[in-house]
Amino acid sequence: MGTRDEYLRGLSRRVYDKLKDNREFTTLYNDAQRAGRSAPTVRGAAPTAAESFGEGSLEQAMRRDRERSGLHVESFESAQPPPYVDGVLAFVGYMLSYRWMNLLAYQEAFTSGPQAFGVDEVYGALVDFDHWLTPPPRTAHEDQIKLHQLLSQLSAGYMRPLVAYNPWSAARDNGRTLKRVLDALDARGFVGVKIYPPNGYRPYGNARYGLPVAGAPTGRELDDALMLLWTQCADRGKPVMAHSGHSMGKSDAYEDMAGPLGWRELLRALSEQGKVARINAGHFGGDANTNTWTEEIAKLMATPEGAALFADLGYWDELRCSGAPRMCEATRRLADAATAHPVLNERVMYGSDWLMLSQERRWDRYPFDVLAATRTFLNTNALFGGNAKKCFGA
């Protein structure tokens, strides 16, 4: 396979060969490069020459990303930073890289590098999109579990994996999916489970509030498959992480499935069974000012049924406030929620959603930006470690 640099060089050529004849892409890329490289910057942050799309573009974007040589959002004079096309190519590069390469890139940026924030461990979540999206994965889920088990072991526990659960598969495969998940939890060092409601299902309450999806199990069947997971995880003391932002679905209707309604239904159903499941509402409702999900999840945390409901600030990119009112609004909304619901100091965790975050400028600065945005209204020690230990286990 060669070195990481050799792999990225070949990958860069392959991506160029795929896209070089796509006039729309190359025009958008070249125009955005010129706009981004010529944007006015603050004193001491000199703009660089624009580069046309070529066979080395992805490799160069990845090199600049690893060298942390790009400009931070605060380096630009305008309230809204210009387009960042290096981030698009870097994101593609990471998506097409081997997982060990990405783990090293993460560790270098956040832990071992000279300017790293000092992350002690990372939670790496698998996701199961079978049936909801096509085509099916090229690598069997069992093999992906074994790979993440090995990565965790080789990193001396630095990467702690979460196994994926898919209620569509679980409703149709006579227990195979649940058995695979429980084996990962019981025998392979996995610390929790990941579900993905924007695929088209709520964490619970699909029988009443579900979304009709062609070929999918009924809402009741999905609820039954999900409750099996919730009760098994509650009995084992294992957390379940789920996307809780209005994003990453096929449509608004799919993205609605990640909202507070499903969490209220779940907490009610678990309470009726005398069960308490640890839950991480990933993205804490999302950073966009388009709904009240963050506030509603915070309210749920303050209820008796929500005593084990946590949330993370993964990819709250608008906390990286550069002066744009739209971006600073995210900080104000989070601060308002923390003031109204002090329980947030006991439940909200730092998170990065790193692979998605990798398309942003100087993503290695993200934890510093989150700290700067929240230090006046959230407990720093709890946000950066204490609450994660309570949710995922020390």
Predicted ranges, named:
Residues 1, 127, 244, 284, ...:
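Active-site metal-binding loops of divalent metal-dependent hydrolases
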